[in-house]
């Protein structure tokens, strides 16, 4: 089962991260967290790896509606978006909220998940068209 929406990006890694943040902002998402996985693994384990950033993206309006419908939905928030390098290519991938929220038996959550997924797909597509 696919759980992410991924596109290869024809940009340098740092530019892809910046463009991804901008594209998410256009769709109403703010970045709550930004984790530089490569730097963290180097610091904690002295391990080398490819560039890899996890962005914790939150759309306040959608999150508010989700929390009104299901208090424990915070266990599945925020929506993670990753930008990473693999064998010299750069990729952007967003979680598919419809898949992640499938575990919640609540029709209102399903509808919010569909709306969030549409916005995330638009953001990823926007970066891939740069």
Regions found by a protein language model. Name each.
Residues 1-28, 125:
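Terminal, regulation- and interaction-focused segments at domain boundaries
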Residues 10-12, 58, 84, 95:
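Solvent-exposed residues in well-ordered beta-strands and their adjoining turns
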Residues 16, 64, 101-103:
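Intrinsically disordered, low-complexity acidic/polar segments
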Residues 18-19, 36, 69, 119:
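Short Gly/charged-rich anion-binding patches and loops
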Residues 24, 75-87, 124-130:
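Short secondary-structure transition/capping segments
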Residues 30, 36-82:
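Compact, glycine-rich, soluble single-domain proteins
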Residues 80-106:
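Beta-strand/loop substructures that line and gate deep hydrophobic ligand-binding cavities in soluble
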Residues 103-130:
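Well-ordered alpha/beta subsegment
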């Amino acid at each position: 089962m696919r759980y992410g929406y991924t596109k290869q990006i024809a940009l340098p890694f740092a530019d892809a991260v910046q463009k991804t943040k901008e594209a998410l902002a256009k769709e109403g998402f703010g970045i709550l967290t930004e984790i530089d996985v490569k730097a963290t693994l180097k610091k904690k384990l002295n391990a080398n790896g490819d560039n890899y950033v996890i962005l914790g993206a939150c759309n306040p309006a959608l999150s508010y509606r989700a929390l009104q419908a299901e208090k424990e939905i915070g266990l599945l928030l925020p929506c993670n978006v990753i930008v990473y390098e693999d064998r010299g290519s750069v990729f952007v991938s967003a979680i598919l909220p419809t898949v992640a929220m499938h575990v919640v038996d609540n029709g209102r959550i399903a509808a919010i998940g569909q709306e969030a997924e549409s916005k995330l797909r638009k953001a990823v597509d926007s970066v891939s068209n740069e």
